[in-house]
Amino acid sequence: MKKLPQGISTFSKLIKNNYIYVDKTKYIYDMINEGEVYFLSRPRRFGKSLLVSTLEELFKGNKELFKGLFIYDLWNWNHDYPVIKLDFTKIGHKNPQVLETSLDDFINQKARDFSVNLISNTLTTKFAELIEQIHRKTGKEVVILIDEYDKPINNHLDDIELAKKNRDVLRNFYQVLKGNDENLRFLFITGITKFSKTSIFSDLNNLTDITIQEKYAKICGYTQNNLESYFKEYLLELSESTEMEYEDLLLAIKKYYNGYSWDGKNFLYNPFSILKLFYTKKFANYWAETGTPKLLVDLLKTTNVDLDILIKKEYEFKGTFPNFELENLDFHTVLLQTGYLTIKNEILRPPNSSLYIIGIPNKEVEESLFSYILGFYTNFSAESIEPMTKKMLTYIYKQDETKLQKSLETLLHKIPNLIYGEFKNEIEAYYKVLVISWLQLLGFDIESEIMTLEGRLDALVKHKDLALILEFKYDDKKSFQTMLNEAENQIIKRGYYKPYQNMNISILTVAFKSREVKCKFKLLNELLKEYKNRK
């Protein structure tokens, strides 16, 4: 049985040491034959570096590594090319000076590797000279592979001015690529984000962005077929250790880890989570182990964001994959490019551009996103969120409003004063998002702001045969009892419960006042009787 390639992104190491390699060379072959300059955006831990490493070995002509793969009999092994691979995870970037020095050191090292002498002094002219000299010395066109091109920018979004300065360094550095067409055989650039104003996307007129092209939607990540064919033995082992039927296991894995897509048709697994699942033989949130992207952390610190994405089922964008502007950071774009949102569907509307439906990929990512944002806004650690949610689940099942109320009070009291001040003008919506997000973490199916014939209810929690209708009220001037009564009356008067009468229906009303909260559970039949008496 081949080994699990955990943490290995070097193609030669996978092949030589009997690790599983999911063959992506068909997409590589098509890409190379159709063009010369490409950009690909994918979230972290999705196989970008392995893809770059595979391209490196292919262009170097290391034929034996590709035996048995799709490309082996199709590639012209009589030609090899000099390769410059620039991995920005190995380039210093704490300020523009360090970035320039690190890039200069990289160029000097490459000059030594290829035994060429450089006389230029500036960074950009030296890079251009390096490419030209390698071409001249070898008599072969040069292949350039740039991995994580955006790291010097998105690692500094907590300091936009510094990020801009690093962007300017990169813009000048990348401009060299435009004037070197005659020296280049192939250029491939990867990153998490697609930043504007870095010259890659404005100056490289012949660049093809394959991020959301259907043809290359499966170039990174594992398909369902990949999972069931390459990892068959590991699936059987997991089925035995978890005592789950094989088909039930596949469904569970799909629900928890599948769902990433860049065309709305082909849905994928993140390799990191799947490999961890097979290694530990436990269903768990491995996405969180990779760490929340600094990009998302910094955005939450510096910008008021629309938290409704936590509870809405869909979000839309039109046209091409959205660019990222340092001057105008957009929360939804961050979530999309970092993998917390994915393309669920593409609606073609000729002659206009496509409309993309965006949503959270799977249960693992949902838990990661909710846990992180709740932790950020309430000062709860990820470790403390899980046990508290389990307790709340018990309180809801038992409809223990006293203990549930205490949990909600704990939640509200943990909100830092600074954040409370920022949201004070829209605190009702903010509280509602926090409470519903917490319920989502409990494993409930949450539907928020559902339109009915008579109006819009705040939220509906469904679990098995239970339907829990939620209504929130916030008013600093009214009493808690008044707000709770108003919420109950609204549910009955507008008939929010009518579509769910085939289920066991309970009502949960929640009233907020400043940082205080009161909640009330009632069975529907009980509330209907009370409503008649109130009238």
For each predicted feature, which ranges?
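Phosphate-binding site recognition
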Residues: 1-427, 442-443
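Structural signature of nuclease core domains in nucleic-acid processing machines
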Residues: 401-535
